[in-house]
Amino acid sequence: MKFAVFASLLASAAAFAPAQQSARTSVATNMAFESELGAQPPLGFFDPLGLVADGDQEKFDRLRYVELKHGRISMLAVVGYLVQENGIRLPGDIDYSGTSFASIPNGFAALSTISTAGIAQIVAFIGFLEIAVMKDITGGEFPGDFRNDYIDFGWDSFDEETQFKKRAIELNQGRAAQMGILALMVHEKLGVSLIPN
């Protein structure tokens, strides 16, 4: 209760504080990134926290790379969640004690079933990927470009407009997947399934 009163006092005091004069910077920043990938209708360039208010292109590219990475991981997470909910499991055992993949429950309940050593292996593998494999590659054509001489899938056969469109589709699907996996996790905690029976 005391915290709520204190917070309301701070809010009312802030109402009479002089405003910062940053409108010109905000407009200039919006114009700098308005033509970037992801600045699409209806929002256009959307940076409510002012993370790139200084107009730093390198910082913007880093944040775009992180957004793409989280979107790709979220797309895999949504597919994995739906596959598990439909009862499709890997064959065999997850450990040497005979715990089968089929006996592990879905969602958050799986974390209590997997041993601490197993969780540590997963975290170590993700850390290895972050540090060694999926580090921020600046030599690519665009942020998140992990192509090399072995993996290409015909990307260079597309014209520039098609490449831009496909990158925008991936970005939007990644954004939707981030919201989707969060919705699945929240509903699981609430005890309400989003998956029809």
Curated annotation (Swiss-Prot):
Transmembrane region(s):
73-94, 114-134, 174-196
Q: GO MF terms on file?
A: chlorophyll binding
The entry's keywords: Chlorophyll, Chloroplast, Chromophore, Light-harvesting polypeptide, Membrane, Photosynthesis, Photosystem II, Plastid, Thylakoid, Transit peptide, Transmembrane, Transmembrane helix
Q: How is this protein situated with respect to the membrane?
A: Multi-pass membrane protein
Q: Which SUPFAM superfamilies match?
A: Chlorophyll a-b binding protein
Q: Which GO terms describe its cellular component?
A: chloroplast thylakoid membrane; light-harvesting complex; photosystem II
Which family does the record claim for this protein? Belongs to the fucoxanthin chlorophyll protein family.
Q: Please give the subunit comment from the record.
A: The LHC complex of chromophytic algae is composed of fucoxanthin, chlorophyll A and C bound non-covalently by fucoxanthin chlorophyll proteins (FCPs). The ratio of the pigments in lhc; fucoxanthin: chlorophyll C: chlorophyll A is (0.6-1): (0.1-0.3): (1).
Tell me the function of this protein.
Answer: The light-harvesting complex (LHC) functions as a light receptor, it captures and delivers excitation energy to photosystems with which it is closely associated. In chromophytic algae, LHC is associated with photosystem II, energy being transferred from fucoxanthin and chlorophyll C to chlorophyll A and the photosynthetic reaction centers where it is used to synthesize ATP and reducing power.
Protein name per the record = Fucoxanthin-chlorophyll a-c binding protein F, chloroplastic
Native organism is Phaeodactylum tricornutum (Diatom)
Report which gene this protein is encoded by: FCPF
